Amino acid sequence: MWTADEIAQLCYEHYGIRLPKKGKPEPNHEWTLLAAVVKIQSPADKACDTPDKPVQVTKEVVSMGTGTKCIGQSKMRKNGDILNDSHAEVIARRSFQRYLLHQLQLAATLKEDSIFVPGTQKGVWKLRRDLIFVFFSSHTPCGDASIIPMLEFEDQPCCPVFRNWAHNSSVEASSNLEAPGNERKCEDPDSPVTKKMRLEPGTAAREVTNGAAHHQSFGKQKSGPISPGIHSCDLTVEGLATVTRIAPGSAKVIDVYRTGAKCVPGEAGDSGKPGAAFHQVGLLRVKPGRGDRTRSMSCSDKMARWNVLGCQGALLMHLLEEPIYLSAVVIGKCPYSQEAMQRALIGRCQNVSALPKGFGVQELKILQSDLLFEQSRSAVQAKRADSPGRLVPCGAAISWSAVPEQPLDVTANGFPQGTTKKTIGSLQARSQISKVELFRSFQKLLSRIARDKWPHSLRVQKLDTYQEYKEAASSYQEAWSTLRKQVFGSWIRNPPDYHQFK
């Protein structure tokens, strides 16, 4: 039906053609990360491939995001008008929610071209059965999925581990982030790298299912800029300090790619030991900030949550019969481990039970493309040669949604690019995908639906604040509570007063 390379190429072309220069990295000096949601439509009468005749599908990018930054907790605001987390995956998901809101509006106003059809209960909708959604990311998600075995012939991509820093890697119960002074020096696999990675012979196994772990190595890049080779493997992470398995070419696992995301209070914590035993896998982690701690969970953790609760969030669950799940995740060319992805996104939650009707741990298909994002850290590093100055992450984030009004949204530091201190708090200083604006769009949608056609969850009581609307989505809240009790008990949640806006 489709391949990982086809998804990656579609997203790269969309980024190059549909997104303007504004918000993109400065050539040879900045890099960024890319994520997107792709809608795949199969012919209604042919949902499956057959050996003699593959099904022809229609692929469309419906949301896209770029970004590498988070704001610190001291910059968070209680009126919902700032983006706390601007990592590409989160921007793409919030942009996807804008798209879903628009599609629900089309359905509610009886338009024929909506992705939704009426559900079995009054006032709710469900996704058409000929549609699925695939999530693309140019890089492995930060956090648990980025703890990847490293072979001895690979250049060291992370900063040295100093014992005084390692011993300070834990966090107090009252805080939620990194050791002092580390400031994102050791990031996910697309983080700053001081040496070019060597090209290893071989061809990437580009399509692997969640049930198997295959050794992968990258050969010549198929399209885009010439890049340094990036090697990946799928050796077990647990017990790497004493691992004796030998990879092809007699290369031992000597270290792991580091994630800058730090363990949350209540988790066991990393050992901080030099080499392969540095990280403990499977833990909840918080994204790093520069100086000021953040309250943003890692992308690995958020994507694992989406795989149980859906991508629609609590608000939209009022209007949906079932959660909106991703069918597959495709990762671009980068350091990668199938085992780490499987563990981080699926394995940690696979034994969750007693979820409400419609919710469940999804059999997410996880694949990797052989195509490199041309504005990724490693691609820019390879092209810039002796360019003066440091290579730094782009400070802007781009949101794009397949909606007719203001599809593009460019932000920096959580606000629309160009926002000044004087304009903060005004309507023009709000991102289209901020909590308050998504809530406003949700309320606007409700205003276009006759009250007697609202779902029961919205008619049973008077709701006023963002928090009240979220809490009233009872099935979603029950599923989220179950997930926290059974697996994610240390998940950092913002206090209710951050959700009291109207």
From Swiss-Prot:
Tissue: Ubiquitously expressed.
Active site residues according to the UniProt entry: 89
Database matches in Pfam families: A_deamin (PF02137)
PROSITE patterns: A_DEAMIN_EDITASE
Region named Disordered: 174-194
GO MF terms, alphabetically ordered: metal ion binding; RNA binding; tRNA-specific adenosine deaminase activity; tRNA-specific adenosine-37 deaminase activity
Job of this protein: Specifically deaminates adenosine-37 to inosine in tRNA-Ala.
Positions bound to Zn(2+): 87, 142, 299
Sequence intervals crossing the membrane: none
Catalysis performed (reactions): adenosine(37) in tRNA(Ala) + H2O + H(+) = inosine(37) in tRNA(Ala) + NH4(+)
Coiled coil: none
Family to which this protein belongs: Belongs to the ADAT1 family.
Single GO BP term: tRNA processing
Cofactors required: 1D-myo-inositol hexakisphosphate
Occurrences of domain A to I editase (ranges): 63-501
Lineage: Eukaryota, Metazoa, Chordata, Craniata, Vertebrata
Keywords annotated in UniProt: Hydrolase, Metal-binding, Phosphoprotein, tRNA processing, Zinc
Protein name (record): tRNA-specific adenosine deaminase 1
PANTHER family hit by this protein: TRNA-SPECIFIC ADENOSINE DEAMINASE 1
Cofactor note: Binds 1 myo-inositol hexakisphosphate (IP6) per subunit.
UniProt KW Metal-binding keyword: yes
Residue numbers bearing the Phosphoserine modification: 191
EC number annotated for this UniProt entry: 3.5.4.34
Positions with a binding annotation for 1D-myo-inositol hexakisphosphate: 93-94, 302, 305, 435, 470
